[in-house]
Regions:
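Acidic, glycine-rich two-metal-ion catalytic cores of nucleic acid-processing enzymes
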Residues: 200-301
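N-terminal leader/targeting and assembly helices and adjacent pre-domain segments
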Residues: 1-196, 289-327
């Protein structure tokens, strides 16, 4: 089954979110250039003296390597470098989390509305209200578990903090020394590896949060439909390409009651209550299965008459009191 319009609109929002995150880390990367160059330029002078001793046979390769490692273990200059880089990365990570939190309410409302649209496309106007992201933001205050959200304290528990960053920086330089890399390679590796690792992790976190918000929003409409007397169930729809995990490809097309979990233990794709291996970086979505109705050729009625094949944009317009057929 091809992804629906709601999925496509969500992907568009995700691309914009990923760009904001990418730009944030690009700024952090650029800001580290002078800091790292300055440190390794000074380190190069001292390193050249020790290398000369090695070449002259005054010390062994092992002694030279231990000297280099000692500069990390007790070097104040390295500690200053490490702290500056870690602080930059922590700030970039905090910005990425803020971007995710800013985007997900809009994703939730978009998919809540789209799910309502797909239901009304075959049942007629049953009174769904049009939501916006401000509505969702107000609900999050009352119901914190409504959708994925990363407050500062929770973000720190996820390892996005200074202590974690310092360990990664030390590990990067230590690895370069043990591999016998040149000063230039050490500097390049530190700058690219730390930024790329943090950026890629942030983008995967964004994808996970967006998928969770997308499908939590759809579930909201499914439960609302049931309260209106519409019998519907939920169907797992996988993104069938080479990047989809095998277990989710096997879930494609599985249908369960709205209050039940799918066979992988998730209520919906990106379920924050699911196991990490089932939700992290998930790109699947939900569709509604309405009992006794073939949705493949549905027609719509708004207050102004029957409207076949109404688009999502037209449906939104009608909900604002601007009937598509009224024109």
């Amino acid at each position: 089954m091809r992804p629906d319009k709601g999925y496509d609109l969500t992907e568009k929002e995700l691309k914009a979110l990923e760009k904001r995150i990418y730009d944030s880390y690009k700024e952090a990367y650029d800001g580290l250039t002078d800091i790292i160059k300055e440190y390794f330029a000074k380190f190069a002078d001292r390193d050249a003296s020790e290398k000369a001793r090695l070449d002259a046979g005054d010390i062994t390769e092992e002694q030279y390597k231990h000297w280099r490692l000692a500069q990390i273990g007790r070097g104040k200059r390295f500690e200053a470098l490490r702290d500056k880089v870690a602080e930059r990365m922590t700030n970039a990570n905090a910005a990425a989390v803020a971007y995710v939190n800013d985007a997900t309410p809009g994703i939730y409302s978009l998919n809540r509305n789209f799910a309502a649209y797909t239901i009304e496309q075959v049942t007629g106007d049953v009174g769904f209200d049009l939501w916006d992201e401000q509505t969702v933001k107000r609900l999050i205050v009352e119901q914190p578990e409504l959708m994925p959200y990363y407050p500062p304290k929770r973000a720190l528990k996820r390892g996005i903090d200074l202590a974690w960053g310092k360990k990664q920086i030390t590990a990067s330089v230590t690895s370069s020394i043990l591999q016998g890399k040149s000063i230039k390679h050490m500097a390049d590796d530190l700058q690219s590896r730390i930024v790329t690792m943090n950026r890629d992790s942030a983008i995967r976190t964004a994808r996970t949060a967006v998928t969770g918000a997308q499908n939590a929003g759809r579930m909201d409409s499914y439960f609302a439909a049931e309260k209106m007397g519409i019998k519907c169930r939920k169907e797992w729809m996988a993104t069938l390409d080479g990047r989809t995990r095998h277990s989710h490809a096997m879930l494609d097309g599985e249908v369960v009651d709205n209050d039940k979990k799918f066979s992988n233990g998730c209520r919906f794709p990106g379920d924050p209550q699911g196991r990490p291996e089932e939700i992290y970086n998930c790109r699947c979505t939900l569709v509604s299965v309405i009992e006794g109705i073939d949705t493949s050729n549905g027609k719509r009625r708004d207050r102004y008459g029957i409207m076949p094949n109404m688009t999502f944009a037209q449906w939104e317009k009608s909900k604002r009191g601007e009937g598509y057929l009224q024109r």
